[in-house]
């Protein structure tokens, strides 16, 4: 249950050489529009869409686990999990050697330290401020009249380092406007913004420690400029990126639900 959308992953148990194995077979997103304010209704719609596309009924699903800010409002869920528990498990499934997981979505960012079983053993987050999350970058891209994708691509064309001191969206937007008025190239402004977001995210991750393989999950994986800024801030040469970053926490929920059925 994200701030912008609901993600669903359906896990199916199949037999491989006589042994049961899990396969994630269906994923579906229902975008929560501005008037769609009921998390339970949004979750119901997304869940029903997945069941219909898989040709299943609710009676054929053994458990429904949910995570995210709206998890307590999803009445039909079997159990709710924290974002850290679900994200760590999903990241571990995709990258078994991962020990540092960074989760950056629209409204929140967090860093997690995980063990070999995909359990979050420590975490730090920015739940009270969007300055370390995707919505901050999105607001700044609007100030430059660019899409978020264009914003990320533009930042890759800059090699300048421009510090941004503002700690909230309102003041940062004023800073961006000042840079525009001083004829600073858009590429340099885009990099400055993404560097600032990456710096705040990195500060959270450093509170739990950076070790082992680093994995980035959440919607900001799609922003190539942010990924590069985060590498620089963390001082790492590589960050592992899953193919379906928005679904990793939903996948983690499904994996934990499956484990608890056995």
What positions do the PLM features span?
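Glycine-rich phosphate-binding loops at beta-strand->alpha-helix junctions
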Residues: 2-5, 69, 210-233, 245-247
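Glycine-rich phosphate-binding loop of actin/hexokinase-like ATP-binding domains
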Residues: 31, 83-144, 259
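Conserved ATP-utilizing enzyme core subdomain
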Residues: 131, 138, 142, 146-182
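Conserved phosphate-binding/catalytic loops in two-lobed NTP-binding clefts
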Residues: 83-84, 231-251
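Glycine-rich phosphate-binding/hydrolytic loop that grips phosphoryl groups
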Residues: 134-138, 242-262
């Amino acid at each position: 249950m994200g701030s912008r959308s609901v993600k669903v992953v359906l896990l199916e148990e199949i037999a491989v050489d006589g042994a049961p194995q899990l396969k994630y077979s269906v994923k579906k997103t229902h975008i929560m529009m501005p008037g769609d304010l009921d998390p339970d209704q949004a979750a119901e719609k997304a869940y029903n869409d997945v069941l219909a596309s898989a040709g299943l009924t609710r009676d054929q699903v053994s458990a429904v686990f949910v995570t995210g800010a709206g998890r307590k409002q999803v009445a039909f869920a079997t159990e709710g999990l924290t974002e850290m528990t679900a994200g760590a498990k999903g990241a571990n499934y995709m990258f078994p050697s991962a020990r540092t997981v960074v989760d950056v979505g629209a409204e929140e960012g967090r860093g997690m330290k995980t063990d070999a079983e995909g359990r979050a053993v420590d975490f730090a987050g920015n739940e009270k401020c969007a300055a370390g999350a995707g919505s901050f970058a999105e607001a700044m891209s609007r100030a430059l009249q660019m899409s978020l994708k264009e914003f990320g691509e533009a930042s890759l064309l800059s090699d300048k380092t421009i510090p941004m001191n503002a700690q909230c969206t309102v003041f940062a937007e004023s800073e961006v406007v000042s840079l525009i008025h001083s004829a600073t190239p858009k590429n340099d402004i885009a990099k400055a913004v993404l560097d600032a977001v990456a710096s705040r995210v990195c500060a959270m991750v450093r509170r739990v420690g950076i070790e082992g393989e680093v994995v980035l999950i959440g919607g900001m994986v799609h922003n190539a400029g942010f990924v590069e800024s985060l590498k620089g801030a963390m001082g790492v040469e590589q960050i592992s990126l899953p193919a379906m970053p928005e679904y990793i926490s939903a996948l983690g929920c499904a994996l934990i639900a499956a484990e608890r059925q056995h």
